[in-house]
A protein has these predicted regions:
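Structural signature for solvent-exposed beta-strand/loop edge elements and short helix-capping sites
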Residues: 1-226
C-alpha cells in the first residue's frame, strides 16, 4: 500500500512507500510502488525508484517503468527521463508502446511528447492487429510517428503484409524502400522494391522496382510510379 504522498505541482502527485528529500540539492527520491499522477493531463507513470530534480523539473526513473497516457496509450520501458514542463518522456532502452487499436510499437532510443502524441524512435517495429489475424509488420531504421492520426515519416523501411492480402496464403508479400511516409490509410515508399515470393523457398526470384510504391491499406492495392 502506498503510505506517502508528495505534491510537486498543482494537480500533480507522487505516491510511494517512502521518500527521501535531499534539501541542499533540492532532490526528492521516491522508492517502492511509485506512482506519478496528473489528473488534468490524464496520465499515470509507475515504477519502483524515481528521483525528482526540482531545479531542472526533471524526473529520472530507475528500472522498469510504465506510463498510462490519456486512456489511450501504454508505454513500457526502463530508465525513463521525464521532463515535466515539456511533458516529454525519453529512454535509450528498449520500449513498447500499445494503443487502443491493437497496434503495438517496439522501439529503441525513443522520445515521446505527451501533449502532441508524437514519438521519435530508432529501430522501430510496428505490428498492426497485434496477436490477431491479418497482421502487418512495419520496420523503420528511424521514424517520427504521430499516434493521434498515424501520420509518419521514416528511413530504411520494410513492410511485411499479411499473407492473404492478395488471396494467396502461400505468398510472403513485402516491400522495401529507402524512406517512407504515410498515415492510417496508406504508405508511400521511395525507391521501393516489392516481391511476394515466399521466403526461403524455391520460388523464382522476382521483384518490382519503382521510384515510389503506394500501399493502400483500405483498398488493399499497390500502385507503382516509375
Amino acid at each position: 500500500n502506498k503510505n506517502s504522498k508528495a505534491i510537486y505541482e498543482k494537480n500533480k502527485f507522487i505516491f510511494a512507500d517512502s521518500f527521501k528529500f535531499i534539501r541542499n540539492e533540492n532532490i526528492l527520491n521516491a522508492n517502492g510502488n511509485v506512482e506519478i499522477k496528473d489528473s488534468l493531463k490524464n496520465y499515470i507513470i509507475t515504477g519502483e525508484n524515481f528521483t525528482y530534480y526540482k531545479e531542472n523539473e526533471k524526473i529520472i526513473t530507475k528500472g522498469r517503468t510504465e506510463a498510462f497516457l490519456q486512456s489511450k496509450y501504454k508505454i513500457t520501458s526502463s530508465d525513463i527521463v521525464f521532463l515535466i514542463k515539456e511533458d516529454n518522456l525519453s529512454s535509450i532502452k528498449k520500449t513498447k508502446i500499445e494503443d487502443n487499436n491493437s497496434q503495438v510499437y517496439f522501439t529503441e532510443n525513443f522520445k515521446y511528447s505527451i501533449n502532441k502524441e508524437i514519438f521519435k524512435g530508432e529501430k522501430v517495429l510496428i505490428i498492426t492487429n497485434y496477436k490477431l489475424p491479418k497482421s502487418d509488420k512495419f520496420f523503420f531504421e528511424n521514424a517520427i510517428i504521430n499516434l493521434k492520426d498515424q501520420r509518419f515519416i521514416a528511413k530504411d523501411t520494410e513492410i511485411e503484409i499479411h499473407k492473404d492480402i492478395f488471396d494467396n496464403t502461400e505468398n510472403d508479400p513485402r516491400i522495401k524502400g529507402v524512406s517512407s511516409e504515410g498515415n492510417e490509410n496508406y504508405t508511400v515508399l521511395n525507391k521501393g522494391v516489392f516481391t511476394s515470393c515466399k521466403k526461403n523457398d524455391n520460388c523464382p526470384p522476382w521483384a518490382i522496382q519503382s521510384k515510389t510504391i503506394k500501399h493502400d491499406k483500405i483498398k488493399k492495392t499497390l500502385n507503382y510510379d516509375n
